[in-house]
């Protein structure tokens, strides 16, 4: 194991050495030359011309990086460190740069962005929320504009026109969800002017910030665009009432109980519930039905299961909050609200019923994609985060991305203390309060990380209300009494009398009795515990001011995080991933100065205002004063910013002397990465700091995944909450539990990807063909329409014209009725004459007649109008069929695992069934399009002709598992070949005829 770790780190060190030689040294050599350039944009244009003439990006990297570094120096007052140049090169190579908090990932991205923007194909910088997208675009904008590059930013409220403009910019800052939804919406567009992504190279190069959060934590969350489904919602209220009446039982367990008890059992690990036979009978009685799981009642059974899941597995202020009468999901990884996101399969409606709020109509999926498959569509992708190395295997296996750990600019000196483990959650929280009180009294800033809104508010309440701590004092007192019961004498009697009123105890009351207590042993331990409890209560009574940062209090997020490093500051926050603001010791003078100027009416994000603030904070007052005059900033504001700077500087020295920011984790997360993200908030850029996690065996991680043997051992040994549990077995149990969950979640994500890959291949085929119809030339649209008519007519005819059956026995009346249902224009066709032909010839004759009827229909409407009708019809039919197909796949997937009981591989079965469903959908699309094109009535003001879009090459999708619209993109025409589809053969024949004419 050690050898493997050594090899991993050796590989990383070799990579870093390579970057120093190939990137850092050449860029540094160019620095003096670039500093003298009067026009950086002109120099950047020269690089662009070189690239257009054939120079590779790798060849242009040193000069592009040097220009970007100089632009940052001139317009932001920031210079890329050497290690940041390495980070930029890692991103350019399509890898993941692991960079610790405070190492300047935002600035690093500008290097790879500027280099890859030379292609003119657009670069997307992907962030986790709107605030970071806007902040980074405005903050780094001057660097790009200094090089002559345009910058776009997309927000949730951006209009289609604003989105289109932003995506056409050289650099686009956008959140992962907005980007994914724009892709899905583009593939639902019915005219080219509805598209917002670029027509050519819509997904060229993406740099994903917090890449582990997006590609791993959110990998299981599909992006879904949905429309209302036809389903009664009042039933959910009834199911919520029935769920309340059902009682939770215990599952069957070998050697304990043969049968499950109660009405249902719960599997928290898998977030699933199972009705017992008793529960099924009770539910049937309450519903007034028989056979809850019979086909006609399956919908009711599904709704009841979701109601029980909502009751047992989804908790208010942990998984969701209720705000303004709406159930809003809380992101389990970032602690942020996700308005607009809804749980699927009726679960959201079940939660709404449980909470008694208005139930929104259930939705049907119109388009969907997972982040896993969406980001794999990019020609090149890269990522950056503070924590990725632990997940390198997953990044390599699923995304083909290596992780490079970029060295810090200064060594990390943060002290990470061992975990403190308690038997119960109550004991753990008392210990956390004691630690906070101790650090607060010293003046050391504390950041407390919790995993849910509920826990953050509970801890806040304990700090606000000293009475909630009294049980801890009483427990400590009982332990001391027990340890000292054999002690005799007048002094002991005085002490016992004093201890009769514990709530009134003060530190000074206990001080005179210090000499009574021996220096070592149980009595000393109990005495120290009592003293600590008395002192903590005294500090709580004086008050511990603190800030709570969770999804309910997100409005002041940046301000709270920016000032979390000030002395005597206590901040309680839910998961810290993607908070985007550095915690600076002594407070953030730049943020305070920006807030001051904003209050005075200045735009804090305007680059000259930002530059002024940076110069002032850095003490470069002469340069700052020149900018102040230009911006109209008054002298008294300069004086106030100077005071802010000095206050923060003095406080920083005070905090450094106290040991820096101290991190308290109140629970181990399922993933070590999330724990490391919290730890990483302290010790930025070589600052001092410390961290410690408090764990209890009531925590979800330990309760669900820790070894039963360890818990049984603790029960036998009679551990209580007076002292933490220190045992190597416990420490190993925590590590194993996290590893077990990480492995399980990786397996789930791999399985999700395996199943989603089947859908992904089908989606690529449909979307590529759909894009061909939307953006292709008129002749290509006509070719597709004719191909569908041919396939449909031929397929219908072959059902009746069996070559194995004598022509006299063919059901021509049935054939006629079927064909006229699709193409009424064939009314006058001489069907009786078909008996004189062979089956194949008869089919060809019918196809030719249908094509003549189609040509006549085109002449009747005019070619431009016919093309517009074809586009409209094909796109609408495809969208409706695809919507239904997604629903069918969803139903298939829900039940496919039952086939495992029949000794069949569920995935292989899913693949076979999904392919069959896809082929059926394709046949349906062709049939419906043909029917619509023949039968559609066009009124006086019909469909407005769509102006033919400029020809855009669409990457050819492999027609798997079936050729979709009967045609492929036009190529040089070879003579007809055997083995081609009928549509392809006829297309080639038509092109051959045209060529001869």
Swiss-Prot record:
CDD domains, alphabetized: DEXDc_SecA, SF2_C_secA
UniProt protein name: Protein translocase subunit SecA
Lineage per the UniProt record: Bacteria, Thermotogati, Deinococcota, Deinococci, Thermales
SUPFAM superfamilies tied to this protein: Helical scaffold and wing domains of SecA, P-loop containing nucleoside triphosphate hydrolases, Pre-protein crosslinking domain of SecA
Region (Disordered): 950-997
Biased composition (Basic and acidic residues): 957-971
Enzyme type, top EC level: translocase
Catalysis performed (reactions): ATP + H2O + cellular proteinSide 1 = ADP + phosphate + cellular proteinSide 2
PANTHER family: CHLOROPLAST PROTEIN-TRANSPORTING ATPASE, SECA INNER MEMBRANE COMPONENT OF SEC PROTEIN SECRETION SYSTEM
UniProt entry keywords in alphabetical sequence: ATP-binding, Cell inner membrane, Cell membrane, Cytoplasm, Membrane, Nucleotide-binding, Protein transport, Translocase, Translocation, Transport
